[in-house]
A protein has these predicted regions:
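P-loop NTPase motor core
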Residues: 86, 96-142
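Acidic active-site catalytic centers that drive phospho-/nucleotidyl reactions
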Residues: 13, 60, 112
């Protein structure tokens, strides 16, 4: 049985048979305002609680509100959340590579959201964008 990371949201965890599968790349899709970022923050909080010796890498491309983060994190140790804000798909790829080398104990990686970077990069150079996206996806695999 594949271990799962619960979100601590009963309805979501029921749909996901207990939470997201660990050791896999999961895509959360939905319209704007449907709670994708809230779910990502909840999963981050639960990963920090479940694995206190690890860190969570959170890639923020949307300008996450610190107020929203503190509401969800409550008394959870937010110092275990490594927040990065890359400026492009290339920067995201390079930053992820560096962080993965520097922090061998990462319990969860969240990219919220990758759409804008992929779209912009793709418009500039389709071949390079596709290659970078595939490389980035491969480095996220355990």
């Amino acid at each position: 049985m594949i271990p799962r990371l619960p979100s601590n949201c009963e309805g979501v965890d029921k749909l996901l048979a207990g939470g997201i599968e660990q050791g896999t790349v999961s895509l959360v899709y939905g319209e704007a305002g449907t709670g994708k970022t809230s779910l990502a923050l909840q999963l981050s909080r639960e990963a920090i609680k479940a694995y206190p010796e690890h860190v969570v890498l959170f890639v923020d491309t949307e300008g996450l509100s610190l107020e929203r983060m503190s509401q969800i994190f409550g008394d959870c140790d937010a110092s275990k959340l490594l927040m990065i804000r890359p400026s492009s798909l290339t920067d995201l790829h390079q930053t992820l590579t560096r962080k993965l080398e520097k922090h061998p104990k990462i319990s969860l990686i969240v990219v919220d959201t990758i759409n804008a970077y992929v779209r912009l990069s793709y418009l500039k150079n389709k071949e390079l964008s596709s290659r970078q996206f595939l490389e980035m996806t491969s480095i996220l695999q355990p």
